From Swiss-Prot:
It catalyses: 1-(5-phospho-beta-D-ribosyl)-ATP + diphosphate = 5-phospho-alpha-D-ribose 1-diphosphate + ATP. It comes from the Bacteria. Pfam families: HisG. This is ATP phosphoribosyltransferase. One of its GO terms (biological process) is L-histidine biosynthetic process. GO terms for molecular function: ATP binding; ATP phosphoribosyltransferase activity. One of its GO terms (cellular component) is cytoplasm. HAMAP family: HisG_Short. The keyword Glycosyltransferase applies.
Length: 212
């Protein structure tokens, strides 16, 4: 039996759907009154751990899970050693740079030198501004980063944007897209190397489904 780390939240339903099509049914995790964090598949070939999206690469990297599904945004930010297996295509959103709508900034180079930029994704934000050779101070927030510009603490934010509705409702506007993030299938490198074909069969099944 192998272990899969499934992400709570927006990616969960599609993650369970793709594993179900590959022969591993963890539908119990979607039940409204469910409080369990571990599930066995209907065929007893695998079990799933229900974890926060940001923790998926941690469980996979440390070997507590053999496979996992995680957003590319989290995977890129974590920098943990995992096997990057497949782009699953769902859960799409942009990692974007946004500012107050009534500001004078229409592109990244308009931002003043050494201004503050709020983000949950500090490594991503730092890498982005370093590549542009723009000196900024990155302010790490774990909650609603939109409050950074609203309160005047930051000139801009780097955050995930799906529909743009949250930005609009808070008087913010995108001025650049950094990358496009989708759900990714990842694996523990040692688990894959020592696999007795159970993991490989599941990966190949998902690859075939994903190609349709």
């Amino acid at each position: 039996m192998f272990t899969i780390a499934l992400p709570k939240g927006a990616l969960l339903e599609d993650s369970i759907s793709i594993f179900k099509r590959a022969g591993l049914d963890f539908s119990d995790a979607l039940e409204e009154n469910n409080r369990s964090l571990t599930f066995e598949s209907n065929c007893k070939r695998a079990k799933a751990l229900l974890v926060r999206n940001g923790d998926v690469p941690v469980y996979v990297s440390y070997g507590q899970a053999d496979l996992g599904i995680v957003g590319y945004d989290v995977l890129r930010e974590s920098e943990l050693k995992v096997a990057k297996l497949l782009d699953l295509g769902f859960g799409g959103c942009h990692m974007s740079l946004a500012v107050k709508k009534n500001s004078n900034y229409s592109k990244p180079t308009d931002l003043p030198a050494n201004c503050k930029v709020a983000s949950k994704f500090t490594k991503t934000a730092r890498s982005y501004f370093d590549e542009l050779n723009i000196p900024v101070e990155i302010v790490h927030l774990t909650g609603s980063v939109e409050l950074g510009p609203i309160t005047g603490m930051a000139e801009a934010i780097v955050d995930l944007v799906a529909t743009g509705k949250t930005l609009q409702e808070n008087g913010l506007i995108k001025i650049d897209d950094i990358f496009y993030s989708t759900a990714r299938l990842i694996g523990n490198p040692l688990s894959i190397r020592l696999d007795d074909n159970h993991l490989r069969d599941t990966i190949l099944s998902i690859e075939s489904i994903n190609a349709l």
